[in-house]
Amino acid sequence: MEKRVLAFDFGASSGRAIIGHFDGENIRLEEVHRFSNDPVSVNGTLYWDVLRLFFEIKQGLTKAKLAGGFDSIGIDTWGVDFGLLDEFGCLLENPIHYRDARTAGMIEEVFRTVPREELYSRTGIQFMELNTLFQLCALKKYRPHILDRADKMLFMPDLFAYMLTGRKQSEYSIATTSQMVDIKTKDWAYDILDRLGIPSGILTPIVPSGTENGMLSAEICEELGLDPVKVVSVCGHDTQSAITAVPSELDSFAFLSSGTWSLFGTEIPEPIVNNTSLSINITNEGGYGGMTGLLKNIIGLWLIQESRRQWKREGEDYSYADLERMALSAEPFKCFIDPDSPEFTPPGDIPGRVREFCRKTGQYVPQTVGEIMRCIYESLAMKYRSTFSMIKECTGRDYPDIHVIGGGTKDTLLCQMTANACNVPVKAGPIEATVLGNIAVQLLSSGDIPDIKKAREIISRSEALREYAPCDTDKWAGAYESFLKILK
């Protein structure tokens, strides 16, 4: 008998509801609802429109019912962001977007109380101003009245699950993105939070990925005409959902989850926390079955997406195919940027910032759209090579290829450049890795799939992969030396 499970996958700019049909051998995807996810700026603060997003969840549930129904629900989202509930379980305010400027300078402020080395050794998480810890410290500093009224904090996938079931809990993978989880105990680092004045009473119990989060509430079932089904706490962080779906037969593999953000790393049984991992600021994120995703967050397709939006604001509506074609026609290796330089994080004039970065670093300043796009593409590929070297240094392993998963697998130019820069084959696919990982954990939770190895085998069988062989590697190796100079 076919099993049907419903996955909600929220990205930074859109969301989908997708039914996974499992016949015991293969997983087939059926998209039933798609919607935009548009942050809203109000009086200088950037918010997520969480109530509209919950409306879209209800729309997805209704459409999935009309498409034949489903046996369970799983929700994954981006990391770090959260909602605060009062003592009556009511949302205090819309969750604030990780790109909001409120966390500027908070890392250094936290280091005055908890030194960098101590915080990393306890949490194993890459330092980024957008991490939940720094968001909460900013909230305590600038809007303490909100924190004073908070009874519970829920990360985005857990918040949506709470709206469906009424249960408050924190799924392990999404909790680790906060930089507030003790890497050894896999529980909250209560003592560190106490020293920073963060009230630990707002935290909810951490549960393993695949834990049931209760049944759809009677209210939701009555409103939408649904039968009660279970909501599963899948890997709530979309990165970890995607890692679950890496179609590798090997126990040790390199992956690049390519989307708005690029997450480059490997999966390991135990965290790696030492001077090397600290010096390169690499993250140990919790995954399914207690595994660790050793990875580096890199600004990814955001640079291309936001550049396209900027040109559209200026009256030029280029397609992604147009941008790729213009990049290919431009001269290679004329200039580079560091994609992770802070000026590239906020929305706005990315092309102008690319020019300014090149000017400041004494490089050729790109003039045309094609030159800017070539610079972005090559810089991303070079950053992947740099990160690949870091992963190999940390683990002491070599990796025969790189699995590129997620939406970026559709970008053939970036996949080829990644193979060229890293000098290993790239295996691209599945595009819907996050959704497939979400579905796989639901099927693992129900016992329909026995283990993660079998899940990956099924996904590999269900999805076609495309391979890119490296070429022009000597030219890329020479240009890499120029790229390294602008990182210093």
Regions found by a protein language model. Give the residues of each.
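Short glycine-rich phosphate-binding loop at a beta-alpha junction
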Residues: 69-77, 152, 205, 397-406
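Carbohydrate-associated surface elements
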Residues: 100
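Short, basic and Ser/Thr-rich N-terminal targeting/leader segments
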Residues: 11-13, 71, 76-78, 132, ...
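Glycine-rich beta-strand-to-loop/alpha-helix junction loops that act as flexible
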Residues: 76-80, 209-210, 258-261, 401-409
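Short, well-ordered amphipathic alpha-helical segments that serve as non-catalytic structural scaffolds
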Residues: 52-65, 185-191, 383-390
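Short beta-strand-loop/turn "lid" adjacent to the catalytic site in phosphate-handling enzymes
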Residues: 62-97, 126-130, 161-182, 205-208
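N-terminal glycine/serine-rich phosphate-binding loop of ATP-dependent small-molecule kinases
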Residues: 1-93, 121, 221-231, 422-424
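Active-site core segments that coordinate phosphate-bearing ligands/cofactors
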Residues: 6-7, 19, 104, 111-123, ...
